[in-house]
Amino acid sequence: MTRDEFRRLTEQGAVLLDGATGTNLQKAGMPVGVCPEQWTLEHPKVITELQERYVQAGTNILFAPTFTANRIKLAEYGLAEQLSSMNRELVALSKRAASGRAFVAGDLTMTGAQLYPLGELQFEELVDVYREQAQALYEAGVDLFVVETMMSLQECRAAVLAIREVCELPVMVSLTYQEDGRTLYGTDPVTAVVTLQALGADAVGLNCSTGPAAMLPLVEAMAEYATVPILAKPNAGMPKLVNGETVFDATPEEFAAAGKRLLAAGASILGGCCGTTPEHIRVLGDAVSGGTVRKPLTKSRRVLTSERGFAEIELDGNFLVIGERINPTGKKKLQAELREGNLNLVRQMALEQEENGARILDINMGMNGIDEKEMMLRTVYEVTSTVDTPLCIDSSYVDVIEEALRIYPGRALINSISLESEKIGRLLPVARKYGAMFILLPLSDAGLPKDCEEKHGIIREILARAEENGLSAEDVIVDGLVATVGANPDAALECFETFAYCKHELQIPTVCGLSNISFGLPERMYVNAAFLTMAIAHGLTMAIANPSQELLMNAAFASDMLLHKADSDNRYIGRMNFLSEKYAGMERVLVRTKGSDQKGGNDSSGAKTHSAVYEAVLKGNKNTIVDETKALLSAGMDPDAVINEHLIPAINEVGALFDCQKYFLPQLIASANAMKLAIEYLEPLLKKENRVEKETIVVATVEGDIHDIGKNLVVLMLKNYGYRVIDLGKDVSAETIVEAAVREQAAIIGLSALMTTTMMRMKEVVEQVKAQGVCCKVVIGGAAITESFAEEIGADGYSKDAADCVKLVERLLG
């Protein structure tokens, strides 16, 4: 199947996918804890009969049962060397079931390993893992690919890049979302669809985790931005415990009725996940047959993304600032830190610029004495771990830009592409491959254009070259190419003409660097502010500037209000309120503890202050926390006080920010890891005789489940709060868990399960604890777990995440 054929298929009407595989294999006798792919090959009739029933129910696309047949997952069972043969044989089973009546998609999913910087797995290693499986599936003859049940946008990117480096078959990508409408890693559906369609996915959507009703608003949000078809593959409701068995509560008729609503909302590719059966798919197919398919957008909206957010660039929208500070030019302190390999100032600049209103951050590492490529990659990792703001990759070297775009977990902006023959032929394909937008710089080999006519001609020529490379005007922002008014009195007027030309003739947004206009003049800030105000009136969309320069920022907010842009009055008032609070004294003031009089508490204004240790935990800064901890100790503070007065309050605030969805999993992990370093440093210094030993907690992922991201974070958080934690790992039997609890005299057992097929193993642990009379409470959590399920199996508590688990434990042991 070609990509064009796939697109035509989705335009003809609703495309029907298959339903659940795992829950149906389990019903057919597949035990928990075995490798699903190996069991399927040992029982081929089970999968072929199931998939034949799906085809008879009207399925257009079958998912081959290759879900976890990647090297990392297969290695859990000692089967990594059989990867190629297993994928080939599993695809053959699906092709046999399809018998030419349905297409077969090679199925890939998460590896379970955490990517750097949260884990040890490097991005390129993950691409290799997916490329190996994609190559095997391609050679097996799949018609297309699906990357499904994904929680990490960066893992999605790795999979799509890997497939695209193997072949040009269609690729569908589907993520799984939590009740708050975000993935476990904090990605919202708009960010996901924008990033992945730009990268080359042919359909983007969501599956698993919820029933169809909860998916409806997510599909509606995606449809506003999607230039590709949207996929929806919900569970048959949420899992419940009935007569000792896990069941899903949506009947085929209820499921189909919800499917019709998903179709109307914009999902044209529909199927079922956990708990669905061929009957669910048959009734769904009947319900959506002949229904109107909502066509994707023909023109993409101009949107940049990070892993956890997006910035839309609208021709008539509110003015945006690209923060310029992360650039060593003219910054001796930053240059010195970069030469030492220190990114503390970079991190601080990123946070300050985001706080001061920058919607995009420019990253430039161009200086002598460092490896620019290496430092660019390190900076991209550091900044994306610190802030949610999309990035603009700024370098004179094509290879630096390409490497940064490859590892960037979103859709970035390139600064910049000109008509210089040495670079344009290399940069445009790079922008296309990685789905980036770019700043069009109207320069040519001849240098600066002599007038507006020549400048506009260069703009048109670069646009034509971009279209030849598969890009469009929607991928472009034009740089006005600001010259100094001191040397050319018409410089500002020429820029205004270009801004107006791009807005009204080309319908393309514009950007400029402000500082050139006033070069060589006294009191430059006033010239810059006046130029900015006039430029916005002529159509300027965004500027590369320092968001800490309040005169410029305030002028931009006021200009938007005077031009009556959408919600600009509220934005202006919000800006003034922000400044009022800033100068009245923030609730939190950073204090570096150099002396004994700076231990935290209250400053002279009465405002609450916090130590740099507190701030390091709050911001997840592993680079500084040990030094800041040493500074507190040097100031005379007792190690126990450092923990109780600084570390614990800080991690409590992190938990509160996580609860209100201002922080997401990456920030939670970063903060917990930073605190861990401080605890490890302090531990040998603690006064053991005065230290109260906290209770023991045994933690495990239940038998048959090899997912441990959430469990590992729970372990880390509980240890940071001083509990003695015994981590039994993953795929642990009920007997082993209870034995460990008895042996270690545990006060609590904590159980994790990601898959619906392993939930019932939790009930086994609860039953054994009660049967043996073990004096121990049991708490549970995981993606498919609910509070009602915890009550049904007799558990003592349910936690929705790691931060909640700490509160639950303290409440139970209170």
Where are these regions (language model features)?
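Domain-level signal for soluble alpha/beta catalytic cores
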Residues: 1-479, 483-814
